Amino acid sequence: MITGDGKTLLDSSVICEYLDCLHDGPPLYPPAGDVRWQALRWQVLGDGILDASVLRRVEDKFREEHLHSADWIARQKKTIERALSALEGEVSVIGQSPLTIGHISVGCALGYLDLRFSQDDWRAGHPALAAWYADFAQRRSMATTVPKD
């Protein structure tokens, strides 16, 4: 992203934090305290799901089949599962907290799982997280930005 004064910003998390500084509403990045660390924790869990999902997608889609690594794919699936389990354990807090970058990151990650790996049915093992996401996905900002294949 290039800012109004010509500076280049790289990486989604930096761009999101920059954009968050440009408005007067409630911050997506809480300034301090437990709520900040909670938001950043959820952001990292969501980003971790996305990172592992993209690595898995690249392996499945773009590498020649004879070069596929079952161990590599299994490692990415385990990474995703650990993050989903952690979020399942915290979903009651997530659902009661004001909107932060963590909510957005988790929502985007779960949407990506639906888009690219719907056959895995992440919801089956994470019913509370699935219920939270069903509500969160109805937000106008989420519903209008659902990726199309």
Where on the chain are the PLM-derived regions?
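GST-like domain detector, emphasizing the conserved glutathione-binding G-site
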Residues: 1-70
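Conserved residues at the C-terminal ends of beta-strands
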Residues: 4, 107, 148
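Non-transmembrane alpha-helical segments in soluble domains
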Residues: 16, 20, 40-43, 84, ...
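Hydrophobic/aromatic-lined pockets within catalytic cores
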Residues: 20-24, 58, 114, 118, ...
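GST-like fold's C-terminal all-alpha helical module
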Residues: 46-131
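Long amphipathic alpha-helical segments
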Residues: 93, 145-149
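C-terminal end-helix/capping segment
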Residues: 124-145
